[in-house]
């Protein structure tokens, strides 16, 4: 079927997850872990990056328990939240074209990226556009074969 062919056509798969300060759109992404694998599932890249929480934000106590995050980790990271988002955006851009996937990506992670990029003065549709672009390239390739 077409979904199986799409997976076979992708040269890379990016599997990612986020840690956040809250489970709502008002929270901020504070950590991203990603692994890039080829079509044989061999690791060809990875990202594990943590940024500081934006100033003035109050994290959810429940999120801190889930993330095992201390106040020091939230406030004394190497990257400002803006620089952190830029590094993540650059990594995902370099990975494309690829299939992006994870455990709760559609319901949570992708939505958090959208709102965090928007709040951080970055292009909020960056991750979604990479995925749409990959689908369009595949569809065009399939149409040209007909």
What are these regions (language model features)?
Residues 5-114:
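Conserved non-catalytic scaffold segment of RNase H-like nuclease domains
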Residues 90, 97, 118-122, 143-146:
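Alpha-helix capping at helix-to-loop junctions
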Residues 131-146:
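Short alpha-helix plus adjacent loop in nuclease-associated cores
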